[in-house]
Amino acid sequence: MVRIAGRELPTNKRVDIALNYIYGIGPWRSRQILKELKVDFSTRVKDLLVGEIAAIREYIERNYVVESDLRRFELLNIKRLIEINSYKGKRHKMLLPVRGQRTRTNARTRRGVKRIIDLKGV
């Protein structure tokens, strides 16, 4: 098992695909990392040399904020928006879309399941 940034990578996948399992590293960034370290994209994780694994691990830790650190950073940014009482903070607090999307229709994922109120007893 190869463990990078606190995450175990699947051994049978190509390296560029497997790096996507790390939160904060997408397809573009994984290829940039492999180009920088001169590792072939088509290499399987199980075929990586110990030195290559160590180089990838060190490069990611030195240059990128990933996994739990990135999640914490994002959460702190949202908390800051809520504390300063900004419009975006209010939208986060009310669990509504933040970036100007309409809410009269759609936004079902963010707002939750529609509930039908039974008014027979009233």
UniProtKB/Swiss-Prot annotation:
Species, as recorded: Cyanidium caldarium (Red alga)
GO molecular function: rRNA binding; structural constituent of ribosome
Subcellular location: Plastid, Chloroplast
Function description: Located at the top of the head of the 30S subunit, it contacts several helices of the 16S rRNA.
Subunit (UniProt): Part of the 30S ribosomal subunit.
UniProt lineage: Eukaryota, Rhodophyta, Bangiophyceae, Cyanidiales, Cyanidiaceae
Name of the protein: Small ribosomal subunit protein uS13c
Location (main, coarse): plastid
GO biological process, one term: translation
Protein family membership: Belongs to the universal ribosomal protein uS13 family.
NCBIfam families per UniProt: uS13_bact
Keywords: Chloroplast, Plastid, Ribonucleoprotein, Ribosomal protein, RNA-binding, rRNA-binding
GO CC, one annotated term: chloroplast
Segments passing through the bilayer: none
